Amino acid sequence: MGEKRLAKDRAWELDFLRGIALIMMLFMHTSWDFRYEFGVDIFSYLEAGWFWAFVHPVIVVLFVGVSGICSTFSRSNVKRGIKLLAATLVLNFGTLIIYKVTGIPCLIIFNVLSVLTCGIFLYALIQFIETKTGADPRIVNLVMGLAGLYIVICGCNIDYMNYCTDNILFIPFGFTIEGEPYMADYMPLFPWLGVFLIGCVVGRACYKDKKTLFANKVKAMKVISRPVEFIGRHSLIIYLAHQLVIYGILFVIFWLIRSAR
């Protein structure tokens, strides 16, 4: 009975939004592999300014922002952070080994998982300070919102700072690094940590009861949303595995095509 109630109260709309973002991300990465890894002249949208200016930011805002909202539901963000840190390290060292052994340019140093890990640990620290000091939640929300907005604004202006360094420790912050190795995937803390914090504020303000805002979902919507919700609920596993699976399938397909000629 309790499990059914939890399932009914679960904020399915967050799973749905994260699932939509992940599907769009999967399509983008598949397009990238076709066009750049296997040299197929399709998916030219990847070279269009409108995609990187408008569509790509929407995908990332959905994924990172919803993750921030979901952090306000967690009983232990420290445990979530440790779990995500482990997954991030596996991905980083895994791609490093593959890059060194095969020469495939798949190295990942700092990406969306790294941003989410930092965001979750930061929010866990904020929760700890809030609990210990008895701070007014409204003040905490205001400070987090302003900090998030400041980080977003800074992140949007980093490209115009024309700051360059040879210190790789600046990679997480989005600065240009001299001699920076090619990274198959990259996402800096600025502006995306700010988006995460703003997501936390939205979660605290709109999901105080930690329940869905759309409890009376119609049957037609259930049929459409369930597969997407499933993807959203298992986003970490899918994200970790998707590029290896997609690249592997395409490698086999193109190998068979070349062998048949």
What are the functions of these language-model segments?
Residues 1-261:
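Alpha-helical transmembrane segments and their immediate juxtamembrane cytosolic regions
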